[in-house]
Amino acid sequence: MKKFNLLPIFAISALFGLTLTACDKTPQVQASAPVTSTMAVGGAPTSVAPIPPSSSASLIGSGVAATQTLPLSQPVKRVVADVSATFIYDPSVGDKIVVTADDNIQNQVKVSLEQGVLKLAPMAATMQQKTPIQITWGGAAPEQLDIMGSSKVIVRQFKGNALNATISGSGAIDVDGQTQQLNIDISGSGSFVGAQLVAQKAMIKVTGSGNIVAQVKQEVGGSLTGSGSVVISGNPKIRNLTSTGSAQAVYQ
């Protein structure tokens, strides 16, 4: 039997131009950083930025207030407040919408006005405001106010045939002005303050621990269930408020 001379492994590697690494080392693969494209209105990419490391990361407000002015393209007939913010109607503002927020949160505040409905797009629960978000607008007064959660709506110098207010949660509404018909429906611990709103007639419904202060001149009716309270001024001639539980109505 013939004997073959084996070339050393290093000689073979040199012969074929191979590069060997130690067997006990694991090859290291460097992953490229993920990117995301930020789209402007209309779909054009405006910048490329790294994806945040975690969706649970908090965005903390800077404490520096900034304002943004938007055109009021149509009258606001209804306000849907389901985001933690304050909505203020003030006719002296004119035909525009003014958004106030922390300067580093301003671009997260998305105002929507479609078919007369004004609202804010949902925001991340991890966002921490230092400057309360405030939406102020003018033009015609809204006729429907719908609040969910802890939002607040302020209406100044209301003038209209009817004002409808619905509060679900711990939100608050503050109104002054005058109206023929006032309709209020509260479920939860919300509050309606209308001591400076002169209403000729009012229909009230409270379920839970909500509170109402209203001024009614002619007629007030409705029902109170739970532990809520209603204070009525204006000395209405017709009083048809009924209550169950510990709820009470007080006339001043």
Please place each PLM-identified region on the residue numbering.
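Intrinsically disordered, low-complexity terminal regions
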Residues: 2-252
